[in-house]
């Protein structure tokens, strides 16, 4: 009995040791799995920390006192024109490099909420003062260019069309650099940019693909947070092979671009002491060929009273080469009289259409207010009066060029 018990003892010890070892292995495996889960969670959190997202949206309601067509308005309430939503994402590749993408969907009739990539670029900080970027970038022609679609960043319901509408292109595909020089109490920034861009027919008012090559320019900006001064120059070569056309109408002859040179000059300034705000820009755009050369300017005065910011804006634009187009109309008219035919009548009609669309003089007076009634949301109201068309149609429907033309706008802007 005793001998048998002693013979079984090594076996019992071995089994106990085996069970203990097995339990220890399971425990170790569980601990290892737990560590892996913790590492995976940390990795996911680390990747998530590299992403940042924000967005912006505008709901725009506008009504014209007649169908003058300013800002695509009609004599009925419309919510599509000027309404949009945008999303912007940034991924931190490393401590000095990031990738940025911005998509915008606009409600206007032509785009009908189709998402469009406005920004898509890599940004690299070479030094604390020098940043280089490459990809699809905003064309930095104006003071509000970086916030062109972000209505919440603007005091009024919209940027002045007479100035910002003088250039149809808003982005370029290429590269730029931004170099900041820190002074005692202010900063001077130098920006240079190069690239090219195609304006597709789907975004063109007259349904014609237009190519912009050899885009190049520079910006100098000085600010001390109260005062800001800015100057910009840009140039490009414009080409297209399709004559302008609108639905159910024949194309307008001689409206293509054959490597025509375009230039842009601009100066701007802003004063903001926390309550009183003054913003102004003066620009000149020149384009070879049939397209108009335009001088334009605006001044916005605003004053903040708690959550309310009433403002007044005066804007003016004037094409400076009307005589060239008017003379072309006269030549085509004489030719039509001397050689009456369908072809000469078509040529005269095209010349007259170019003159009617490209000869523009207009002054717009706008008064409105902004109400920041909730965090990150602003309600705005605006009344704009169009006048001083001179001998032109003022860029509105020719049937109403001699009428009082007014646009009423109510808008909600938000960021998130």
Model-derived features with residue positions:
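Acidic-residue sensor for enzyme active/binding pockets
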Residues: 33, 40, 102, 118, ...
């Amino acid at each position: 009995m005793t001998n048998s018990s002693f013979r079984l003892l090594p076996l019992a010890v071995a089994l106990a040791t085996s069970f203990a070892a097995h339990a220890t292995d399971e425990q170790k495996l569980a601990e290892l799995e737990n560590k892996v889960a913790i590492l995976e969670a940390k990795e996911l959190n680390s990747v998530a920390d590299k992403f940042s997202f924000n967005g912006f949206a505008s709901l725009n309601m506008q009504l014209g006192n007649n169908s003058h067509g300013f800002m695509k308005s009609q004599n009925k309430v419309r919510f599509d024109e000027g309404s949009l939503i945008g999303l912007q994402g940034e991924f931190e590749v490393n401590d000095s490099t990031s990738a940025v993408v911005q998509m915008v969907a606009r409600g206007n009739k032509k785009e009908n909420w189709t998402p469009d990539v406005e920004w898509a670029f890599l940004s690299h900080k070479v030094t604390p003062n020098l940043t280089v970027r490459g990809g699809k970038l905003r064309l930095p022609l104006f003071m509000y260019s970086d916030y062109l679609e972000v209505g919440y960043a603007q005091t009024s319901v919209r940027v002045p069309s007479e100035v910002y509408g003088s250039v149809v292109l808003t982005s370029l595909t290429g590269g730029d650099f931004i170099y900041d020089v820190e002074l005692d109490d202010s900063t001077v920034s130098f920006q240079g940019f190069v690239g090219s861009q195609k304006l597709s027919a789907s975004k063109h008012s007259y349904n014609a693909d237009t190519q912009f090559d050899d885009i190049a320019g520079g910006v100098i900006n000085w600010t001390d947070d109260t005062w800001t001064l800015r100057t910009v120059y840009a140039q490009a070569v414009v080409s297209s092979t399709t004559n302008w056309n609108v639905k159910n109408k024949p194309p307008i002859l001689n409206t293509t671009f054959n490597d025509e040179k375009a230039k842009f000059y601009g100066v701007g300034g802003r004063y903001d002491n926390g309550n009183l705000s003054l913003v102004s820009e003066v620009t000149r755009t020149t384009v070879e060929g049939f397209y108009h050369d335009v001088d334009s300017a605006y001044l916005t005065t605003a004053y903040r009273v708690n959550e309310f910011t009433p403002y007044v804006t005066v804007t003016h634009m004037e094409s400076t080469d009307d005589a060239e187009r008017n003379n072309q109309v006269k030549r085509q008219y004489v030719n039509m009289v001397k050689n009456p035919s369908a072809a000469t009548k078509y040529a005269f009609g095209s010349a007259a259409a170019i003159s009617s669309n490209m000869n523009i003089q207009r002054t717009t007076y706008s008064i409105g207010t902004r109400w920041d009634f909730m965090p990150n949301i602003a309600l705005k109201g605006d009344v704009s009066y169009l006048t001083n068309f001179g001998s032109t149609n003022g860029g509105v429907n020719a049937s109403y060029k001699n009428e009082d033309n007014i646009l009423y706008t109510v808008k909600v802007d938000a960021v998130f």
